Amino acid sequence: MSEASGRAAGNEMPAKKQKLSSDENSNPELSGDENDDSVSIESGTNTERPDTPTNAANAPGRKGWGKGKWKSKKCKYSFKCVNSLKEDHNQPLFGVQFNWHSKEGDPLVFATVGSNRVTLYECHPQGDIRLLQSYVDADADENFYTCAWTYDSNTSHPLLAVAGSRGIIRIINPITMQCIKHYVGHGNAINELKFHPRDPNLLLSVSKDHALRLWNIQTDTLVAIFGGVEGHRDEVLSADYDLLGEKIMSCGMDHSLKLWRINSLRMKTAIKESYDYNPNKTNRPFVSQKVHFPDFSTRDIHRNYVDCVRWLGDLILSKSCENAIVCWKPGKMEDDIEKIKASESNVTILGRFDYSQCDIWYMRFSMDFWQKMLALGNQVGKLYVWDLEVEDPHKAKCTTLTYPKCASAIRQTSFSRDSSVLIAVCDDSTIWRWDRLR
């Protein structure tokens, strides 16, 4: 982590409730308020996440696949539930993220999203969860699904990107307590946001409109659109950058996982040009790259909606609504990921993390900063934590966390950067704090 990134959360965040509306000096092409309404295509009508189309438990060939290999041993990590609270909107909380761009000794700050609300909290060492700020979107029909933290590379202020059913990305500065810019472009709901691991300005968004978009939030440019001819054929539900930020893996309702390289000459040039672009010095709009062809694609891992994907080194962790997170890699075991061709049809499944009662979609797992732990909640409020510090993924040990009053679907989890706190957010608008026992 660079010094600049470390500074971000150190600025004291004022505590207040804010209305979300954008400031006037955002790029009008991307942020025009007059465009806002054009994006709420069929989104206001159905803000809940519908049921999973088919129950995969009785899919052919599922029962014997990898059975018995994953009897989890006792995990070395243990957690204790120390606090919980409930947000007053009584709607599902779909997303939670700790701000990892903070220095040692800085307060542990996390954000939750659900309904038309974005809320920031601080975890106190004694177990308290303190409300810092709450933002409400001006549109009561907005339903935020996802959030992601970054920092301003000039001021080091923390920044929070949020998006949801209306397909509008909003960037919030918690220090000035303003929505400083917003981006309209996706033709439908946005299901996930991710910031590049090495460039705090490169934001990836994935959407119900079947496409991924890469934005430069410093120059307010749309760098590239991934989708089209060989792109996803249904909603994109999740995506992740690899550790170096050279590759993106995306997944969605079409049961597929697709690899997009962003370290190609074409993409490197596009990213550089997005930094050089200055609308004050030219009349021409920025030309976004249209990437129609992924660098690898497979439908051989899952038999249903793929709703969460993360890189683990050169391996992939992905899940569907089939009660298992699958660890796999493109190509054969010995193949180098950098040399995988788009025509590659092989995949190698290395193992599975099995759990139960998680067959609804849009349930997302998370890892800690050092990728030593993996956490996922199920639809009855049970949390699973796996120890990933094993040479063979088959030997991953699991611990199950339960608390009697936590009985609603856990939509997402997030670890604090030092892994001392695990937060889970639920469908009944509750937030649960688990502290790691050392």
From Swiss-Prot:
WD repeat spans: 88-131, 139-182, 185-225, 231-270, 301-338, 356-396, 405-438
SUPFAM superfamilies xref list: WD40 repeat-like
Record's signal peptide: none
SMART domains: WD40
Biological process terms in GO annotation: heterochromatin formation; negative regulation of transcription by RNA polymerase II
Amino acid composition bias (Polar residues), ranges on this chain: 40-57
Location(s), subcellular: Nucleus
Keyword Isomerase: no
Region annotated Disordered, chain positions: 1-70
This protein's GO CC annotations: ESC/E(Z) complex
Keywords attached to this entry: Chromatin regulator, Nucleus, Repeat, Repressor, Transcription, Transcription regulation, WD repeat
Family to which the UniProt record says this protein belongs: Belongs to the WD repeat ESC family.
Subunit structure comment from the entry: Component of the prc2/eed-ezh2 complex. Can interact with ezh2, hdac1 and taf9. Interacts with yy1.
Function per UniProt: Polycomb group (PcG) protein. Component of the prc2/eed-ezh2 complex, which methylates 'Lys-9' and 'Lys-27' of histone H3, leading to transcriptional repression of the affected target gene. May play a role in neural induction.
Protein name: Polycomb protein eed-B
Annotated organism of origin: Xenopus laevis
Lineage: Eukaryota, Metazoa, Chordata, Craniata, Vertebrata
